[in-house]
Design a protein with these regions (language model features):
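Glycine-rich phosphate-binding loops of nucleotide-dependent enzymes
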Residues: 2-252
């Protein structure tokens, strides 16, 4: 078995008397699409923010390719190949779709303003165009991002995460607010990016999502969280057949 790309061990985070994450352990393998599900308040967002360097856990470690990155912030994690999207869109509404991707590619340069006004790297334009084509948003490439539908902006947001050739992409509720008709297309797109190295090395994904059909169809393995703890980890079929999960979360 391959060494894990991401390894989370004993992660804990409390807010006063509330244990948001209570000793979480899991691994993500190279090339794996790993889903995280659970009811509201199960600790998914706190876990996600810890992995992104947005908050500091109280205990435990986060390793990326064997390196302890627990104390690193978002910029340092991006430099090490971690891309991400959030529940709230991160697009620049007054900039064109193409310019949004070009700005995202320079995230490693520092602050938002230095990224916006830094001279572009050679080859970034071609990379942005390739992603625009892959995400099937070429017809709106020159439009301001704020003029697009929410679903189209979501695609731009995800495309921006791929401008740095990430080895690992963390997706926080990619289906939220997206037209149901676009959800299957989004799953197909993520599978293509997972399998096709044409735009860089093959990416792994950690996907936090409430849309159960999407998660079950897309992910290789799924982790179920309840009250800050891991209830189960397994394939979609194993999760479907887990009576403890059914009773606690999925229902009958």
């Amino acid at each position: 078995m391959s060494a894990p790309l991401l390894k989370v061990s004993g992660l804990r985070k409390a807010y006063g008397a509330i244990q948001a994450v209570g000793g979480v352990d899991f691994e993500v393998l190279p090339g794996e699409i790993f889903g995280v599900i659970g009811p509201n308040g199960s600790g998914k967002t706190t876990l996600f923010n810890s992995m992104l360097g947005q908050i500091e856990p109280d205990a435990g470690t986060i390793e990326l390719n064997g390196e302890d990155v627990t104390a690193l912030g978002p910029l340092e994690l991006n430099r090490r190949g971690v891309g991400r999207t959030f529940q709230t869109l991160q697009v620049f509404p007054r900039m064109s779709v193409r310019d949004n991707l070009l700005v995202a590619a320079q995230e490693h340069r520092g602050s938002m303003w230095s990224r916006m006004f830094a001279p572009p790297d050679s080859g970034l334009g071609a990379k942005a165009d390739a992603l625009i084509e892959r995400f099937r948003i070429g017809h709106v490439a020159d439009k301001r991002a704020g003029e697009l539908s929410y679903g189209q902006q979501k695609l731009v947001d995800i495309a921006m995460a791929f401008m740095s050739d990430p080895a690992l992409v963390l997706l926080d509720e990619p289906c939220a607010g997206v037209n149901p008709g676009l959800v299957s297309g989004l799953a197909r797109l993520l599978r293509e990016l997972n399998h096709d190295p044409a735009l860089g090395s093959r990416s792994s994904f950690v996907v936090i999502e409430h849309n159960m059909d999407f998660v079950m169809d897309l992910c290789h393995r799924i982790m179920v969280m309840v009250e800050g703890k891991v209830m189960a980890i397994g394939t979609p079929e194993e999760i479907r057949c887990n009576h403890q999960v059914l009773d606690a979360y999925l229902g009958n």
